[in-house]
């Protein structure tokens, strides 16, 4: 039975074909990149269309993956898979240690400073090398209409309450 769309998490995207035997080139959102290959059954999603695929094999190729999907043996047929997001059910993600979070858990949280001012909501996160950065966008009731970039560090993030949908931060609202 297929997983409901709202229970899926995106772990990569098919960006083009690879070679002439029906393989696809995949951009992985996992860390490390080849963790995506641990998941054999993929739900592919593009423009509201959903289809199932089974990974036969894959390998790391520079900063992308080359993947062979079951039943996909032709370059032109593989080209029709370009643009699909690769999704898996959230329940298949490994459990994390206390105080660790997946990015999808942080997206949508309200960000509140020490003065109890609502700065906005986390729209998405960026990987910068030194530390991850949260992109906080204004929302109804937020302090102003500014987009903010906050470091996802222990110094900035004071607490996270997933049940309440809130993150408390040590951040000057003027930045």
From Swiss-Prot:
Keywords: Chaperone, Cytoplasm, Ribosome biogenesis, rRNA processing. One of its GO terms (cellular component) is cytosol. One of its GO terms (molecular function) is ribosome binding. InterPro entries: PRC_barrel-like_sf, PRC_RimM, RimM, RimM_N, RimM_N_sf, Transl_B-barrel_sf. It is found in: Cytoplasm. Residues 98-175 form the PRC barrel domain. The keyword Chaperone applies. Its main location: cytoplasm. The keyword rRNA processing applies. Signal peptide: none annotated. GO terms for biological process: maturation of SSU-rRNA. Pfam families: PRC_RimM, RimM. The PRC barrel domain binds ribosomal protein uS19. An accessory protein needed during the final step in the assembly of 30S ribosomal subunit, possibly for assembly of the head region. Essential for efficient processing of 16S rRNA. May be needed both before and after RbfA during the maturation of 16S rRNA. It has affinity for free ribosomal 30S subunits but not for 70S ribosomes. PANTHER family: RIBOSOME MATURATION FACTOR RIMM. Belongs to the RimM family. Binds ribosomal protein uS19. This is Ribosome maturation factor RimM. It comes from Pseudomonas aeruginosa (strain ATCC 15692 / DSM 22644 / CIP 104116 / JCM 14847 / LMG 12228 / 1C / PRS 101 / PAO1). The gene is rimM.
